[in-house]
Amino acid sequence: LGDVYKRQEVYERVGELLSRYKSGPLPKAFKIIPSLPAWEDIVYITNPEMWTPHATLAATRIFVSNLKPAQCERFYQLVLLDKIRDEIRENKKVSYQMYEAIKKSIYKPAAFFKGILFPLCDGGGVTLKEAAIIGSVIAKVSIPVLHSAAALLRLAEMEYTGPTSLFIRILLDKKYALPYKTIDALVYHFLQFADKSRGVEVTRTRAGVVGERRMPVLWHQSLLVFAQRYKSDLTPDQKSALLDLIRVQRHAGIEPEIRRELSTGESRGEMLPEPLEEDDDMSI
């Protein structure tokens, strides 16, 4: 029992240091936390809510380097995600140290998506400011294609929000070769709004009269990037359905570009024309 109290006291002191930490070596007692069986409880004793951004970055580096993906996911859910959101809520931005912590967290991509991105998007509570900041990090960091494909599949199946469109556009802009399962899920994601009544924004006249429903600009932008990057992976039927879609969900500036992309190029399953055999008499 004495050891328990002693450990409690040690990690409370470590927590006090982390609440003031700016630079320099961290206590050895903190560095060994990832190797302890009850590491989650130990982290809790250090009171992560009070960690400085510098301490959060240092801790993220230690945990990413020493924990397995499933454990990293827990650290992201229990500590890092809340630290990110609290800083954005208080300052409307993140510090350099927190930005670097987000970047470091993507070194374990499965843990990042399951511990930060999906919890952020689930339930529709993510703000556009949060999405813009985290999305800018995703855009700068290389992510393995299989993890990106799985993330796009999950995002496509989530309840729609504007930030979801932003994350989809950023991942599509990486131009990875995606499996058809992910392509098909994205097609369905867009086609679920082929009924105008499914639009998430409501237009109003100058007099305040409620008009028709429509999809936001972020949605049109993500559809345009999808058409630009993956039109050759779409079947003719999928292209036709998406062309019908933009006749319902219109946007004067973006719709013509989407139509042009979907109306050009090859389609999935189409045979390429065979090259003509050179006449023997013409060969040199």
Label each residue range with its predicted role.
Residues 74-174:
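Amphipathic alpha-helical interface segments within eukaryotic helical scaffold
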